[in-house]
Every structure is written in C-alpha cells, then in structure tokens.
C-alpha cells in the first residue's frame, strides 16, 4: 500500500520549520506532526481511548536481486477502540535492526521504545498536506490528509524510515 499524492491529487509539501510560526495550522496538527514522542501515546491522550494496532503486513525485500542486504517493510493502521482508522504507517528497516529491536509486529513502535527505555529520536524530512480519493476511501472520511516521513535513529544511527498519513478525524478530538 503506497500512496503517491502527486499522481492523483493536490499536495503541498511543507518543511517542519514552516509549521512552527504558521497560525493557520491548528495546534492539534502541530503537536501530531512535530511531536518527538510516540504517536500511539499522543493518540491515547488526544482521543481519551486506548489505541489499537491493526497489522497489515510485514514483508522482506532485497535492494538488488541476489543482494545480501535485506529490508523489512512493516505496514499498520493505528486507531482507537472506537475502530476509527487514525493513521496509516509504513516503516522500512534494515533487517538486522528490525530483528534486534522489533520482536512483536502487532505492537506500536513508539510503545516498544517507551516500555524498553530505549533512547531514540526522529529527524523529520518532510510534512505534506493533500487530498486523495483513494485515502478518503481507505480512511472513510473526506480529506485533506496530513502526512510526514522521517528517519528514526537509535544510538545515533539510522534504523528506520517511517512514512505516516493521518486521518482528518484527529481534529474532532480537540
């Protein structure tokens, strides 16, 4: 499940530094998009509900045919116990990092790091806002949709590239 906003909808790419002082962007989106903490924890606070992870798939790919370098792609829906889909997340890991750190595909990455007391940080590369008929059908709500992608670091080394798309329903919990 890959979404290419450019091919089927309008999109605006926004740098993280453009969000801070923009008064037209609701505070909820600033917190969700720029927060350094676990989205799963933020989701619990925002919605006053436990979050649920719906594991879509975990696949292994090689970068080049017959290459010894393998990558893991994990895709999940995160929602609350009202069964709302609030986020789609796709993460790419080198297989060594994935096997060393991530043992339970049905657990949220943020929860894993928090409960394990692992020190990690993220470097947000890009934020985007756009409309997509495909996303409206998957989330079952009209757009626009915010999204971001970032690199996750552990012990100063990159371990994962994460791509997230957020449901407009998050605005209802303000």
UniProtKB/Swiss-Prot annotation:
Keywords in alphabetical order, please.
Chloroplast, Plastid
Query: Which cell locations does it reside in?
Result: Plastid, Chloroplast
From which residue to which does any coiled coil extend?
A: none
| A Pfam family assignment | Rv2949c-like
The family database entries (InterPro entries) matched by this protein are listed as: Chorismate_lyase_/UTRA_dom_sf, Rv2949c-like
**A GO CC term attached to the entry:** chloroplast
Can you tell which superkingdom this protein's organism belongs to?
Eukaryota
Per the record, the similarity remark reads: Belongs to the ycf21 family.
- The name under which this protein is listed is Uncharacterized protein ycf21
Source species, please?
Answer: Pyropia yezoensis (Susabi-nori)
Q: Which gene encodes it?
A: ycf21
């Amino acid at each position: 499940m890959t979404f290419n906003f450019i091919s089927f909808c309008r999109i605006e790419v926004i740098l993280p530094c453009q969000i801070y002082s923009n008064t037209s962007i609701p505070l909820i989106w600033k917190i969700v998009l720029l927060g350094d903490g676990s989205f799963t924890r933020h989701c619990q606070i925002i919605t006053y509900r436990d979050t649920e992870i719906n594991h879509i798939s975990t696949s292994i790919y090689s970068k080049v045919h017959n290459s010894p370098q393998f990558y893991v792609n994990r895709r999940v829906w995160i929602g609350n116990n009202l069964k709302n889909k609030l986020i789609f997340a796709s993460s790419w890991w080198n297989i060594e990092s994935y096997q060393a750190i991530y043992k339970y595909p049905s657990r949220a990455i943020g929860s894993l790091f928090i409960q394990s007391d692992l020190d990690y940080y993220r470097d947000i590369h890009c934020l985007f806002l756009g409309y997509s008929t495909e996303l409206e059908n998957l989330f079952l709500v009209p757009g626009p949709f915010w999204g971001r992608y970032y690199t996750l670091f552990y012990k100063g080394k990159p371990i994962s590239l994460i791509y997230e798309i957020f449901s407009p329903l998050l605005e209802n919990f303000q």
